[in-house]
Amino acid sequence: MKPHPKIIDRIIEGIRQSRTICVVGHVRPDGDCVGSQLGLTLALRNEGKKVVCWNEDPIPQKYDFLDPEGIIQKPKRGREFDCVIATDAASSERLGSVGRCVAHRKLLINIDHHESNTRYGELNWVSAREPSTGELIFRLLKIAKWPITKRIADCLFTAVSTDTGSFQYPTTRPGTYHVAAELVSRGANLAKICDEVYQSYPVSRARLLRHIYSHFRLTHQDQIAYFWLKKADLARAGSDSNDTEGLIDHIRAIAPVVVACVFEQLEPELTRISLRSKSEKVNVNEIAAQFGGGGHPAAAGARIPGKPLSVQRRVIAAVKKALDSAG
């Protein structure tokens, strides 16, 4: 087996010395978060550990097939754990209320691939060169020699596939295809995953798409595309925030667009922004960092206080500056 970072051995030893474990993930979980949380939880349960899996928010409907028993649950106060493992969360703040509910623990392990990770654990395995946290969990299970069952393979394939944009994003490396191939060979149901994740969505999402195509805006010689989502928009669509994952890709795909942005109003004076870049010269992680957020060079976000139009002006100005600097 190829050499691996020593931190992995320390993580495996920490897990082996723990009996009670809580696996947690970031708020508004995406496919990488859901797949990583579930895949690791299932593997640890197979090893005889007493494991719970917590997330502040419900998982998006399209990932329900991965969790038919409802393993991922809302956090509960007053619990104590030998070990807490955070997956795909760049900071403790990204854990939301879960972070406060897991304060009574002996060890915090942080496994993530975000460039902006704050190294908030006692043991931190952060590899920004990996396109997904799911790939890190796969490596962990392989090195620990913990069995990868068909169900775990489904979870990890979903994690890897979704965070690489179905293996289309520039972060995808040759090794990613090898990981995906091994997961399929271990039983990942490719047809089922593709049908559930990519080939079907609820009517409420179709209504949101209609809203987006009717209201998106282009600026800066059509290099910037953006749209707003307000609570009233979600209510009219019969939708909620769980239906918003991936909506930004529809405006990102417009040919002249270099940077796409979604403004989602969470409260009257709190806006969540999501940024996507198609150019290696425009690092949206750096843009998001200006507003207290972070992520990856090609995909990042932040939560920004302030009046909506003020937030929009500041963010669009920062994007324009980045585009102008890129030439």
List the predicted regions and their residue ranges.
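Conserved beta-strand scaffold positions in the cores of enzyme catalytic domains, especially
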Residues: L108-N110, N124-W125, I224-Y226, V262
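Short alpha-helices
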Residues: I111-V179
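Glycine-rich, phosphate-binding/catalytic loops in enzymes
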Residues: L40-T41, C101-H104, V126-S127, H178
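Structural recognition of alpha->loop->beta junctions
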Residues: F65-I71, R129, K142
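Active-site cofactor/cluster-binding pocket
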Residues: D67-L123
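Solvent-exposed alpha-helices and their adjacent loops that cap or buttress functional pockets
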Residues: I15, K76-R79, R100-A103, N117-T118, ...
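Hydrophobic helix-and-loop "lid/oligomerization" segment in the mid-to-C-terminal part
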Residues: K2-V27, C33-D64, E80-F81, T162-G327
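Generic enzyme active-site microenvironment
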Residues: V24, R28, A86, N110-I111, ...
